[in-house]
Amino acid sequence: MPSDDRLIYLLTRAQHSLMTHLKHELNAKGNTITPAQAGILFLLRKQGHTMTKLSRILAIDNSATTGLVDRLEKSGLAHRTANPEDRRTYLIRITEKGKAAIDEAYVTIKQVNEEIKSGFSESEIETFKKILNSVQEKFERGTRNRIPVS
C-alpha cells in the first residue's frame, strides 16, 4: 500500500493517541473532566451557547452534546438556563466550579500542546496547522462552521 493511502488511518491514530494521552494527563493531575468536556467548558467560558450551537462548533451530533452537557450539569460544572431569545431552547452556561475546573485543566492542555510542538520548528508547526486547516476546509459542508487552528 503506497504511503499516501494511509492518511486517514494516520490522522485517526494520531487523534486517538493524542486524546488518550490528554485524558491520562488530566487524570494524573487530578482533573476529573474529559477532553470532550473541556472543549465545551472552553466554549462556555466566554458566553452561554445552545446545544445546537455547541454541537455545530464541536462538530459532534446533538445526542453526544446532550450527554456531555448532562454530565457537566450533574457534576455542577455547567447549567441550563432559559434562552431569552428563543423560549424553546436553553442556553448552557458555565458555573464557578466549571470555571475553576477548566482553568485547572488549561495548564495540562497547554503542557500537552507544548509536547506536540516539541521537536518541530516554528515553520514546521505553521505548515502543520495550514495542512490541518486545509483538510478541515476541504471536507466541511460550509465555511460558517469552520474553526481555524490558531
Describe the role of every protein-language-model region.
Residues 1-29:
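N-terminal leader segment of winged-helix/HTH proteins
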Residues 15, 42-46, 106:
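Short, locally clustered residues in the helix-turn-helix/winged-helix DNA-binding domain
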Residues 19, 70-130:
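Charged, amphipathic alpha-helical coiled-coil/dimerization segments
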